[in-house]
Each structure stands twice: as C-alpha cells, then as structure tokens.
Amino acid sequence: MKNIPKIIITPGEPSGIGYDIVLDIPKENFQANIIVAANIDFLKDRARLLNKKINIVEVSIYDKNLTKELNNTICVHNIIENGKVVIGKPDIKHAPLVLKSLDTAIDACLDNFADAMVTGPVQKSTIME
C-alpha cells in the first residue's frame, strides 16, 4: 500500500483570505492527508459566515495513524487563541497565532510527522510588531 503524504497548511492572518481558501479544500481530491494548523473556532466562524456546509474536525499533526480525511471534511490541528477576528482588518494580537501555526508546521516537518507545509498569506507588518 502506498503511503499517503501528510501536508500541513498554515492559513496566515485569520482576518485574511487564507482562512477562506482552506475552506475550499474539500472541493479537491488531493492524494494527501491535509491538515490545517489554525484556530478551529476562527475557521468554524468563517465557514458559517461564508455559508460553507463542511465538517471541521480537530486532529493532531502528531498522529501517525491519521488517514485521509473524509469527504467534505477539513482536519484542523487547533492552535488555541482567544480573541475576535474582524475580516479584512489584520490585528497584531493575532501575531502569536500566525507564528505558532508556522512553528507547528515547521516542527512537524523537521520531526518527520509531516511531509510538506504550505503557507497562506502572512501579514508581515502584523508579525513584525
């Protein structure tokens, strides 16, 4: 049986388009386990706002037994953050979330828990402050 690669996606600033983009993952038939390293509540809120009827489930990047996601499902490694997202308004309060998402994906790749990572748009001015 062929191993299915595990790809970690970091969607970037939660007020930006990256969270919208990852909500379209279920439309594609990727031959990989796709995991989004993000805040699951922010992602669920965005799905509701965009009227996306998809399942969003919490998983661990470090689960070696993870199988390809179910149809119409997004797997999320939850990065905990409290706060509010105003779409289109980057907020320096989200910088720790963005950096933690990147660090989590990098560590998973370096530790051989993931085969690749893909980054969404990062608001550099927000994380520089």
Could you describe each region identified by the protein language model?
Residues M1-E129:
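Contiguous, glycine/small-aliphatic-enriched amphipathic segments in soluble metabolic enzymes
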